[in-house]
């Protein structure tokens, strides 16, 4: 059986389970297991079938069984788990994916004793080993670094490809969280491995562990774990309700003060990541070309740097005009606003810098930037450990993701020494000092340790992995999917409220994602989450409907807004537009007249009043409006056409 057939059969079984058609799912699973070499799974399936038959028999007899629903849920959950395991085992022999290649490759005898507990002890000793080796020789240090990274790789691959933890492995994983000697960067990599493992196969123990990891005192570990939880909840949204312990655990998490805020923020950041392709296109096609186009014209502009210090206040106001006239000012402001919003503005810059050997290893995409990484430490040693203030500031910046910091570091260090010096000396000593002062170590540290900064950086790392990795086609790309996290039953208590949904709907509106905006706004009306914002709400709903060309529905929304906030000019203008586009010219005319009272010289309003009058056959009055338009706006072709048409129809040649 080939990979495509296996996945098709599994998908069908999954759809049956989602539709609660357990009997058919069991029959299909039995057929699938005939191709599976694991007899334990067949035995488990036979036990499930027996339990299901007994449950049906008790129901036929009319027996009162208060635990029937719990038994049924367990049967469905167990059936799903058997289907998961059988799919993986069969794909191990059929798939060329790296995941299955690792699973089917026999583990060398020398590594067979390396349990998670053993690996933890090895990682805990790294800092001491590195300190001692630094006193001995470079060869010893290289040996320690190499051993550490080989240990991390082995830990990552074994965790990623482990489909289900045993109770002992779960206990060892808990030791990773409580260890005071384990480097936080190593723990972060382990958390990512657990997340990727769950993306391949559901495992309740791992999900519970990620929820525990969210409570870790280090913000990097905690936020990384929560991002993983949200990813997994999105993937397995239809299965979570089968596990009472998990549902209760999530309900209890809601009592942790920052949990709701963290989940809502990550939700918004994930949606923002989906805008990266648009931003990337805008950067490549608009912003960067505009900047390059204006370089030559700005290069010869005298900025007064040669003036005496006493005359520094004599700045030429024409400089600002030059920026604005070139359009460069608007582009730079737009870029700055995107960056402050948390958008990924560096994707286009770093997309071409992921070809270094470092990125050929899957685990390296998820390891936080560290100067103790072997490639980094070697490069720094070659430079004689010279402290580079500017480079340090760049690498410590919270605006770059971890993988981008590695790309930037390798790129700069690959340049000849002369070019490096030229690049890093572009800022004068005074400017570096100012930058250092503004980005003092303490300020930078606080910014980098903000939960929002950490989660955003990690999401950017994940986005790059799913979009740029050489193995990207082997992974499920969450960012391509519809992200409606508030529809996940396990998170409904956390996200289904006005203070969460209103910003989400506004985000969709701002990004011109009209269908999603309409969906969320309508849901808010259903749950009655307006609370004094009714007029604003109906205006925004109407606007989204209008942009989606649903004019009749938009009119209904605008009329509700008009009831709550009468005679609003913006609302009347859009009612007029929708009535006109819906060919109800009489109603459109009445609202255009209301807008005209407030803005009597608005040329667009005057033109559309004339157009509506013409459509209604009132050509003489329409012509008067077109003459008025011609008077206000000279050489107005629209006015001339209107006058000509009305004169022709009225036979006033």
Describe every region a protein language model picked out:
Residues 34, 526, 559-563, 593-597, ...:
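Conserved structural position within tetratricopeptide repeats
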Residues 367-565:
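Alpha-solenoid helical-repeat scaffolds
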Residues 224, 499, 533-536, 569-570, ...:
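Start-of-helix register in tetratricopeptide repeats
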């Amino acid at each position: 059986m080939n990979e495509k057939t296996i996945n098709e059969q599994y998908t069908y079984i999954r759809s049956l389970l989602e539709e609660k058609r357990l009997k058919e799912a069991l029959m299909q699973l039995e057929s699938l297991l005939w191709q599976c070499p694991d007899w334990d799974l067949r035995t488990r399936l036979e036990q499930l079938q027996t339990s299901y038959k007994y449950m049906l028999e008790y129901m036929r007899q009319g027996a009162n069984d208060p635990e029937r629903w719990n038994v049924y849920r367990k049967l469905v959950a167990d059936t799903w788990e058997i289907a998961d395991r059988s799919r993986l085992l069969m794909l191990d022999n059929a798939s060329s994916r790296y995941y299955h290649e690792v699973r089917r490759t026999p583990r060398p005898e020398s590594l067979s004793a390396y349990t998670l507990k053993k690996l933890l002890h090895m990682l805990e000793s790294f800092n001491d080993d590195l300190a001692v080796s630094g006193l001995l020789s470079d060869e010893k240090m290289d040996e320690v670094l190499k051993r550490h990274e080989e240990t991390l790789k082995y830990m990552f691959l074994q965790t990623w490809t482990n489909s289900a933890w045993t109770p002992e492995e779960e206990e060892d994983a808990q030791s990773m969280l409580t260890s005071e000697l384990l480097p936080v960067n190593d723990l972060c990599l382990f958390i990512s491995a657990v997340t990727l493992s769950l993306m391949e196969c559901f495992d309740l123990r791992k999900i519970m562990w990620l929820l525990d990891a969210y409570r870790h005192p280090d913000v990097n570990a905690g936020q990384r774990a929560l991002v993983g939880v949200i990813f997994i909840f999105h993937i397995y949204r239809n299965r979570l309700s089968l596990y009472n312990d998990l549902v209760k655990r999530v309900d209890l998490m809601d009592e942790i003060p920052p949990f709701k805020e963290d989940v809502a923020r990550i939700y918004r950041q994930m949606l923002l990541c989906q805008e990266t392709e648009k931003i990337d296109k805008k950067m490549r096609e608009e912003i960067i070309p505009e900047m390059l186009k204006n370089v030559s014209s700005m290069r010869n502009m005298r900025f007064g740097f040669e003036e005496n210090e006493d005359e520094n206040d004599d700045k030429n106001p024409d400089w600002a005009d030059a920026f604005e006239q070139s359009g460069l000012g608007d582009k730079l402001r737009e870029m700055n606003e995107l960056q402050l919003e948390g958008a990924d503005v560096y994707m286009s810059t770093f997309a071409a810098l992921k070809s270094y050997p470092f990125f050929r290893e899957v685990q390296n995409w998820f390891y936080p930037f560290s100067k103790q990484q072997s490639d980094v430490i070697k490069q720094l040693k070659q430079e004689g450990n010279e402290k580079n203030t500017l480079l340090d500031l760049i690498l410590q910046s919270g605006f770059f993701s971890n993988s981008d910091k590695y790309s930037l570091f390798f790129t700069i260090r690959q340049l000849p020494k002369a070019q490096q010096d030229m690049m890093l000396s572009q800022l004068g000593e005074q400017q570096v000092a100012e930058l250092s002062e503004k980005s003092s170590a303490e300020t930078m540290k606080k910014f980098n340790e903000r939960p929002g900064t950490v989660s955003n950086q990690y999401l950017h790392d994940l986005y790059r992995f799913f979009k740029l990795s050489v193995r990207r086609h082997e992974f499920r790309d969450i960012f391509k999917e519809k992200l409606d996290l508030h529809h996940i039953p396990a998170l409904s208590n956390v996200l289904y409220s006005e203070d969460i949904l209103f910003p989400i709907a506004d985000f969709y509106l701002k990004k011109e994602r009209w269908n999603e905006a309409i969906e969320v706004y309508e849901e808010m009306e259903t749950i009655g989450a307006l609370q004094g914002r009714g007029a604003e709400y109906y205006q925004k709903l109407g606007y989204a409907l209008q942009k989606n060309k649903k004019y009749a529905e938009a009119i209904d929304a605008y009329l509700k807004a008009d009831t709550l906030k009468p005679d609003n000019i913006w609302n009347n203008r859009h009612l007029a537009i929708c009535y006109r586009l819906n060919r109800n010219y009489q109603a459109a005319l009445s609202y255009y007249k209301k807008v005209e009272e407030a803005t009597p010289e608005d040329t667009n309003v005057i033109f559309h009043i004339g157009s509506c009058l013409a459509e209604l056959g009132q050509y003489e009055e329409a012509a008067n409006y077109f003459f008025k338009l011609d008077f206000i706006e000279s050489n107005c072709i629209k006015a001339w056409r209107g006058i000509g048409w009305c004169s022709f129809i009225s036979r006033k040649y």
